[in-house]
Amino acid sequence: MSHTMPAVVHYEHRDGAVELREVPVPEIGEEDALVQVRSVSVCGSDVHMWRNLLGHKPRVPVILGHEFSGFIAKLGNRVKGFKEGDRIASETAAEICGVCMLCRTGLYNLCPQRKGFGHYADGAMTRFVKVPSRCLHHLPDRLPFRKSALLEPCSVAYHCTAVNTRVQPGDFVVVLGPGPIGLLALQVARMQGAGRVFISGVAEDAPRLEIAVSLLGASRAIDASKEDPVEVVKSSGDGLGADIVIDAVGISTTLRQSIEMVRPGGQVTKVGWGPAPVGFSLDPLVAKGARLQGSFSHNYRTWERVIELVTDGKFSLDPLISRVAPLEEWEKAFSKMEERVEVKAVLTPNGPI
C-alpha cells in the first residue's frame, strides 16, 4: 500500500477552494477501522463548501465526503464484531464525547462535541478513511456499493420523516425542496402511508420535480416560480392546509411558507440548512398550535432500519443516481449537482464498482 493517496480537499474558506491533492494514508487507533472507500456520494453540503456557502465554518484543510461505503482494510486490536474484508457503511459522527446524557441515551447525533466526517474530521473522498468502529454497519452482499453510498441521506430522510415526524396513514404531506433529501423524504412519507404528497421547487428544479411525480409517486409538483405553494396547498382538500410540512430547503422563504401552509395542530419539520435570517413573525405558528420540529442526522437504530429498507428495495434510488464517476472527476460531478442538472453523483476512489 502506498503511503499517500489522492483526496478531494477543502483548504480555505473562499469560493472554489477545493482541489485534488496527495495526502497521507491515515493511521488508525485500537478502536478504529481503516476503510477502503468503494463509493462516496456527493452531498449538497459538499457543493456548498466548494462555493463557501455554508452557514458555519468547517475545519480547513479537510477531506470532503461523509456518505460512503467500502471494505474494511485494517482493524484496531480492540475492535469486535468486524473483520478485515467486511463490507460496511459508516455513520457520520466521526467524533463524539461518549459520556454526556445524549451519547449515553443513543442521541449521540446531538452531542454538543460531535464532529462530522468531511466537515470537522477528514472524510471519504479519498481511497482510505479512518472510521471509529462504533460508526460501522455491516452491509448485505446483495446491496451494491452504488446504492450503499446513499444510505446516509436515506437515514437523514428517514430520521426526519419517520422518527422526528410521525406521518399517519392518510396524512396530507408537503415536501419543500426536491433535492436528494426532499426526494427521499417523499418516499418515506409514502412508506408511512401518507395520502397525498406534494413537492415544491423552483424553475431550475424542473427535472427533479418530474422525477418526483413520474418515478417516485408524488401526487403533485409545484413550481414556486409560477404559482404560490401556500395557495396551492390551501386550495387542496378541506382548505386547512397540510398535516405535515417537511422543509428540506431551510431558507427563510420556505420556513415562512411552511408555517403558512401547515394546518392547525399540524407539524413543520425543518431538515434543510440555510444561512438567511428569519425576518418574519412566528406568531402564526402559535395561533395554529402547530409544532416546529428540527431534525438533524440519525442514529444507530435508524441506520439499521434504513439498511433493511434499501436492501429490500423500498427506496427507489436509481432515479436519483445520475452519475457514477472516478474521484478525479469530482469537479464535474459537483458542477452538475450545483446546476441541478443531476440529483446525486457517486464517486469511486478505488476504481469501478
Task: Enumerate the language-model features and the residues they cover.
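C-terminal hydrophobic helical "lid"/dimerization subdomain
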Residues: 1-3, 184, 227-228, 235, ...
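Short N-terminal strand-loop motif that marks the start
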Residues: 1-69, 350-353
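Glycine-rich beta-strand-centered segment in the early N-terminal region that forms part
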Residues: 26-40, 53-101, 135, 140-142
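NAD(P)H dinucleotide-binding glycine-rich loop of Rossmann-like/cofactor-binding domains
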Residues: 95-176, 204
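Mid-domain Rossmann-like dinucleotide-binding core that forms the NAD(H)/NADP(H) cofactor-binding site
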Residues: 143-226, 231
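Glycine-rich phosphate-binding loop and adjacent beta-alpha segment
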Residues: 194, 199, 207, 219, ...
